[in-house]
Swiss-Prot record:
This is Integrator complex subunit 9. GO terms for cellular component: cytoplasm; INTAC complex; integrator complex; nucleus. PANTHER family: INTEGRATOR COMPLEX SUBUNIT 9. Belongs to the metallo-beta-lactamase superfamily. RNA-metabolizing metallo-beta-lactamase-like family. INTS9 subfamily. Although strongly related to RNA-specific endonuclease proteins, it lacks the HXHXDH motif that binds zinc and participates in the catalytic center. Its function as endonuclease is therefore unsure. A motif (Nuclear localization signal) lies at residues 545-549.
Length: 637
């Protein structure tokens, strides 16, 4: 069993597991932090951005050639754990020869579609007059400043996919539900479990009859809107692969939400606007719910909330119809009937308005001060670029970062000098290291496998030994482009036996309570299922010269020698030898058993726990005679 690590980002994993002749890809996250190396894409040509200085020559490291770790066309199945971990799916399904099946829950697919659609829309609606590609040249790249000169396999970086590729990729997905058992080629069974992180987010159990691998990715124990995490099903795992922990282990999500609300209120009271760069699904639901409870008490009920995204309407509607994927409290509201999320009431009362873009209706309804939720969190494309240009010159305005995926200082770099206030309130509800340690003690896997980053403290806080995984035995770590041999071997395989063959078996008791029977059978294997069938009967001799068909050529079953069991008591064996005329017998003890020496016959008998050897000098009659005496002490079956 081997694990191939294709991603260096622990929160956006892409691993391939080879298990029982089945090749399974675990997630296909898209690391978009590379976008921070590029200038923002404004909706309108920006003289300020256009006049930013270009790069200057630096001495760099030599370019490393691309190395193929695995042929992705050999992948049989892709398991998706949440919608953030499927953003690279079109690159794999459309450009690698992949012909397998993708499994994911319905909310994961629908919200993943929205994220991809928003990404494609943001990129395609800002066509560039010219496209730069010279920087991918090996000789040029090593002269670029860091981090571009240190980036891995820059020549393989691709343009954003199209909606046609997105639709084609999503058509290969088969929808599954929590605890649904899916059989893969008769070899292994995979089961999605609720991970508690996002709508439809899953952990996966991959098991055969005698082995069990758990894949934990992007899980949460906090009580937010998704179904709670299923921990019980993770018990008794041989291997637990752990990815997708919180990116900000020192930040408390509840404290960050409180800070978000207080900074938002302070800015609006002073006449400023608040910009919240965000994804169109996920944390935004929780932020809107907190604001629903907060704005009236803070006297902000007249301040408009704007949600701007090409998929804003779809996102808000989807969150209300996936009732069975929500936590119990929100599920119960559906039967009252009430909308599960309070943002429905915010929309009805016109406190929250959503728009596909800043054109059209938004331009007519726009009034300040206000709060704007829009993308993209990298500040490199999307409507957020326009608002950064619009509001960045005033110290009354504030940008609040809630998504932890991007460094806010790097995101702000192209907009400097910046007068507006910047608040960093990253909200990441995924498991922290304390919760992981408690979880591992409860489920007790035999082995834990995780990214290298989780086995050592963060570089900026090297003294914080509590910010790493602590388990026994110590976790096995991996890094990008590594192949890990998982530390357990398959020992058993399940085989069914046909009733007529079972009826023919004659068990013999070799020890009290233990019986054995020999089986002569034909092993039939199909779709990784094994069946023992009765051996074919010997073919009857046929007269004439009729030619046999190939199908009639059934191999004859040889008559097998009986198997032996039992042990030889040395004292009784010596007495038996003496009764049969052997004299001058000596017995010597060895590390493995005994040696019986027949000095007169110049013969040696080695008696060990699992074998007996008779060594004599070319006297076959003597050997056979001694063999028969040995067999008297053993059982045949």
């Amino acid at each position: 069993m081997k694990l191939y690590c294709l991603s260096g980002h622990p929160t956006l994993p892409c691993n391939v597991l080879k298990f029982k002749s089945t090749t399974i890809m675990l997630d296909c996250g898209l690391d978009m932090t590379s976008t921070l190396n590029f200038l923002p894409l404004p909706l309108v040509q920006s003289p300020r951005l256009s006049s930013l200085p270009g790069w200057s020559l630096k001495d760099g490291n030599a370019f490393l050639d691309k190395t193929e770790l695995i042929d992705l066309s050999t992948v049989d199945v892709i398991l998706i754990s949440n919608y953030h971990c499927m953003m690279a799916l079109p690159y794999i399904t459309e450009h690698t020869g992949f012909t397998g099946t993708v499994y994911a829950t319905e909310p994961t697919v629908q919200i993943g579609r929205l994220l991809m659609e928003e990404l494609v829309n943001f990129i395609e609606r800002v066509p560039k007059a010219q496209s730069a590609s010279l920087w991918k040249n090996k000789d040029i790249q090593r002269l670029l400043p860091s981090p571009l000169k240190d980036a891995v396999e820059v020549s393989t970086w691709r343009r954003c996919y199209t909606m046609q590729e997105v639709n084609s990729a999503l058509s290969k997905i088969q929808l599954v539900g929590f605890s649904q058992k899916i059989e893969l080629f008769g070899a292994v069974q995979v089961t999605p479990l609720s991970s508690g992180y996002a709508l439809g987010s899953s952990n996966w159990i991959i098991q055969s009859h005698y082995e069990k691998v758990s894949y934990v990715s992007g899980s949460s124990l906090l009580t937010t809107h998704p179904q709670p995490m299923d921990q019980a099903s993770l018990k008794n795992s041989d291997v637990l692969v752990l990815t997708g922990l919180t990116q900000i282990p020192t930040a408390n999500p509840d404290g960050m939400v409180g800070e978000f609300c207080s900074n938002l209120a302070l800015t609006v009271r002073n006449g400023g606007n608040v910009l919240v760069p965000c994804y169109p699904s996920g944390v935004i639901y929780d932020l809107l719910e907190c604001l629903y409870q907060y704005i009236d008490s803070a006297g902000l009920s007249s301040v408009p909330l704007y949600f701007i995204s090409p998929v804003a309407n779809s996102s808000l509607e989807f969150s209300q119809i996936f009732a069975e994927w929500l936590c119990h409290n929100k599920q119960s509201k559906v039967y009252l009937p009430e909308p599960p999320f309070p943002h429905a009431e915010l929309i009805q009362t016109n406190k929250l308005k959503h728009y596909p873009s800043i054109h059209g209706d938004f331009s007519n309804d726009f009034r300040q001060p206000c709060v704007v939720f829009t993308g993209h969190p990298s500040l490199r494309f999307g409507d957020v670029v326009h608002f950064m240009e619009l509001w960045g010159k005033s110290s009354l305005n504030t940008v609040i970062f809630t998504e932890p995926d991007f460094s806010y200082l790097e995101a702000l770099a192209p907009y400097q000098p910046l007068a507006m206030k910047c608040i960093y309130c990253p909200i990441d509800t995924r498991l922290n290291f304390i919760q992981v340690s408690k979880l591992l003690k409860e489920v007790q896997p035999l082995h834990v496998v995780c990214p290298e980053q989780y086995t050592q403290p963060p570089p900026a806080q090297s003294h914080r030994m509590d910010l790493m995984i602590d388990c026994q035995p110590p976790a096995m770590s991996y890094r990008r482009a590594e192949v890990l041999a998982l530390p357990f071997k398959r020992r058993y395989e399940k085989i069914e036996i046909m009733p007529e063959l079972a009826d023919s078996l004659v068990p013999m008791e070799i020890k009290p309570g233990i019986s054995l029977a020999t089986v002569s059978a034909v092993l039939h294997t199909k779709d990784n299922k094994h069946l023992l069938q009765p051996p074919p009967r010997p073919a009857q001799p046929t007269s004439g010269k009729k030619r046999k068909r190939v199908s009639d050529d059934v191999p004859d079953c040889k008559v097998l020698k009986p198997l032996l069991s039992g042990s030889i008591p040395v004292e009784q064996f010596v007495q038996t030898l003496e009764k049969h005329g052997f004299s001058d017998i000596k017995v010597e003890d060895t590390a493995k058993g005994h040696i019986v020496l027949l000095q007169e016959a110049e013969t040696l008998i080695q008696i060990e726990e699992d074998s007996t050897h008779i060594i004599c000098d070319n006297d076959e009659m003597l050997r056979v005679r001694l063999r028969d005496l040995v067999l008297k002490f053993l059982q045949k079956f």
